[in-house]
UniProtKB/Swiss-Prot annotation:
<keyword id="KW-0809">Transit peptide</keyword>
<keyword id="KW-0035">Amyloplast</keyword>
<dbReference type="GO" id="GO:0005983">
    <property type="term" value="P:starch catabolic process"/>
</dbReference>
<dbReference type="InterPro" id="IPR003385">
    <property type="entry name" value="Glyco_hydro_77"/>
</dbReference>
<keyword id="KW-0328">Glycosyltransferase</keyword>
<comment type="function">
    <text>Chloroplastic alpha-glucanotransferase involved in maltotriose metabolism.</text>
</comment>
<dbReference type="Pfam" id="PF02446">
    <property type="entry name" value="Glyco_hydro_77"/>
</dbReference>
<keyword id="KW-0934">Plastid</keyword>
<comment type="similarity">
    <text>Belongs to the disproportionating enzyme family.</text>
</comment>
<protein>
    <recommendedName>
        <fullName>4-alpha-glucanotransferase DPE1, chloroplastic/amyloplastic</fullName>
        <ecNumber>2.4.1.25</ecNumber>
    </recommendedName>
</protein>
<feature type="transit peptide" description="Chloroplast">
    <location>
        <begin position="1"/>
        <end position="37"/>
    </location>
</feature>
<dbReference type="GO" id="GO:0009501">
    <property type="term" value="C:amyloplast"/>
</dbReference>
<dbReference type="GO" id="GO:0009507">
    <property type="term" value="C:chloroplast"/>
</dbReference>
<dbReference type="InterPro" id="IPR017853">
    <property type="entry name" value="Glycoside_hydrolase_SF"/>
</dbReference>
<keyword id="KW-0150">Chloroplast</keyword>
<dbReference type="GO" id="GO:0000025">
    <property type="term" value="P:maltose catabolic process"/>
</dbReference>
<dbReference type="GO" id="GO:0006006">
    <property type="term" value="P:glucose metabolic process"/>
</dbReference>
């Protein structure tokens, strides 16, 4: 029996040549380089020359083999050359990421409200410098202007229109639609005063729209194409007609309009169009100007590698073009008045529940119509955002129905939503889309099942984490990869404000769970906790980055005054926030979110 003579005879001396195992390659060195290793072992006196040869050989790139080729290799057979180069790639859907929640109205802006001009561009550049790849905004619809709505982006008059108060006057000057000397003096207000801003900006935006309509250049051609866009036409005309009627009739809602207009008689609508043709055209041109500026921001964000996450309220306001033009899709009586309205029972945001008063959908009628209204709405959202959150996602599994005559949300009952039939129709029409499910509040098993069936991430909020026991789903050790974790949402207090009113027992839990809370600002302790979470996506609010108290809170649910008004302090510029950007980027790198 033949034996081998190697430098380690005590290991190999008795091994037959035929049964001798193949030399195992060094980690990262292809099998074809084994001759180099053998040369070093057999001829120690030539180790230096062999090492040089090995170094040269290692530098030769070997492409990883095709997966199919590897799969075809039988058990025990030799794998293709380059097999050890088949390193698993990180799928984009598995890449960890982080972003900032900041509604555009909260940017500084020169005219009392944030806009889509230089400050929005500066914010995107700051996000890039901070290593963030997400900008989350609230709904971009025109905010509610009636009593009690107080600028709410969740009470808009149309689900598809853009908020024209966000239009930058300075960008209109660049487009040649306004003159420099027509711009008003800067309006530096600590908080947004929506009526004041509207009185200042709306006449100038209307003037710019009128000049656009009178022009014959490239911009006018773009406007004509905008109106023909299938994602725009239809809802745009309904919204313009609705606005024209609304301005001409002093009524609380369309329910009080004269019967021919209330019920959309063709002759009545034609009469309104002829009488208010100029207003209607200007209205539509303003929507084009919003779209033009927003797409400019989206294009710049994409250039920087930043995705924009939108927000879609599940319900729409009763006094809206959506309900007026699509009555059969809502639970209304024969006169057009809601039979039931939306709300939620008591939850973490409100001890008495919340009465939203939006009309509920007639899901049976919608399903019979192929969910056409919703498909159009989703297509519009995809025109504005890279991904979006569906607010009150649980309403698609089961919704809280409150009789319209009730004054409190406690008087209600649960009713079944459209469930998978809705998403089956949606995905068939538009394909798979990036949806985030807002699954806060009363979350039952069917809501979880629905969310997982469409592979939509849910949410966790750290401000909810420290009450209750160790099984609290908002505690970081209970997070899941398929989640978006927040320090707080627009409905929460700032972290500083939350901390100032947190019961002492819960504070002690925070100190035990987050030891760094003893050594740093509490807002940054929660930011760190959010970024270190196993959740794929982490979102922090700009208020928490700035370490602001309750005076910077965006919204207090179940209240009607003082909400949606916060703006970044006038003393702060994005240039001055370089230290915060560096601090955030360091944390993102530490937790693999760059």
């Amino acid at each position: 029996m033949a034996t081998l003579s190697l430098p380690l005879p005590h290991l190999t001396q008795a091994i037959p040549a035929r049964a001798r195992p193949r030399p195992r390659p060094l980690r990262g060195i292809p099998a074809r380089l084994l001759s180099c290793r053998a040369a070093m072992a057999v001829a120690p006196d030539k180790e230096e020359a062999a090492a040089v040869a090995l170094d040269k050989a290692v530098k030769v790139a070997v492409a990883a083999p095709d997966r199919a080729a590897v799969a075809a290799v039988g058990v025990g057979e030799e794998l293709p050359e380059g097999y050890d180069q088949m390193m698993p790639a990180v799928e984009e859907a598995r890449r960890r990421r982080a972003g900032v929640l900041l509604h555009p109205t909260s940017l500084r802006g020169p005219h009392g409200i944030g806009d889509l001009g230089d400050e929005a561009v500066a914010f995107l550049a700051w996000l890039r410098d901070a290593g963030c790849t997400l900008w989350q905004v609230l709904p971009l619809v025109p905010p509610g202007r009636k009593s009690g709505e107080d600028g709410s982006p969740y009470s808009g008059q149309d689900a598809n229109c853009g908020n024209t108060l966000l239009i930058s006057l300075e960008e209109l000057v660049k487009d040649g639609l306004l003159m420099e000397n027509e711009l008003p003096d800067p309006l530096d207000m600590e908080y947004v005063e929506f009526d004041t801003v509207a009185n200042l900006k709306e006449p100038l935006i209307a003037k710019a729209a009128e000049r656009l309509l009178l022009s014959r250049g490239e911009l006018r051609t773009q406007y004509d194409c905008f109106k023909k866009n299938p994602n725009i036409s239809g809802w745009l005309e309904d919204a313009a007609l609705f606005a024209a009627i609304d301005r001409s009739i002093d009524a609380l809602s369309w329910y009080e309009w004269p019967e021919p207009l209330k019920n959309r008689h063709l002759r009545a609508l034609e009469d309104i169009y002829q009488k208010q043709k100029d207003f209607i055209e200007i209205f539509m041109a303003q929507q084009f100007l919003f779209q033009r500026q927003w797409q400019r921001i989206r294009k710049y964000a994409k250039k920087l590698g930043i995705s924009i996450m939108g927000d879609m309220p599940i319900y729409v306001g009763y006094h809206s073009a959506d309900v007026w033009a699509n009555r059969k899709s809502f639970l209304l009586d024969k006169n057009g008045f809601p039979t039931f309205v939306s709300g939620v029972p008591p939850d973490a945001f409100s001890e008495t529940g919340q009465l939203w008063n939006s009309p509920l959908y007639d899901w049976k009628a919608m399903e019979a119509g192929g969910f056409e209204w919703w498909i159009k709405r989703i297509n519009r959202a995809l025109d504005l955002y890279d991904e979006f959150r569906i607010d009150h996602f649980r309403g698609l599994a089961g919704f809280w129905a409150v009789p319209s005559e009730s004054k409190v949300a406690l008087v209600g009952s649960w009713r079944a939503g459209p469930r998978n039939a809705f998403f089956d129709a949606l995905f068939k029409a538009v394909g798979r889309i990036n949806i985030i499910a807002e699954d806060l509040g009363v979350i039952t098993e069917d809501v979880v099942d629905l969310r997982k069936s469409i592979e939509a991430p849910g949410m966790a909020v750290l401000q909810f984490a420290f009450g209750g026991g160790s099984d609290n789903p908002h505690l970081p050790h209970n997070h899941e990869f398929d989640q978006v974790v927040y320090t707080g949402t627009h409905d929460n207090d700032t972290v500083i404000g939350w901390w100032q009113t947190l019961p002492e027992e819960e504070k002690q839990t925070v100190f035990k769970y987050l030891p760094e809370a003893n050594r740093t600002e509490i807002s940054w302790a929660l930011i760190t906790a959010a970024l270190s979470s196993v959740a794929r996506t982490s979102m922090v609010t700009m208020q928490d980055i700035l370490g602001l108290d309750s005076s910077a809170r965006m919204n207090t649910p179940a209240t009607q005054k003082g909400n949606w008004r916060w703006r970044m302090p006038s003393s702060v510029s994005f240039d001055s926030l370089s230290p915060e950007a560096a601090k955030l980027k360091e944390l993102l790198g530490l937790y693999n979110r760059l």
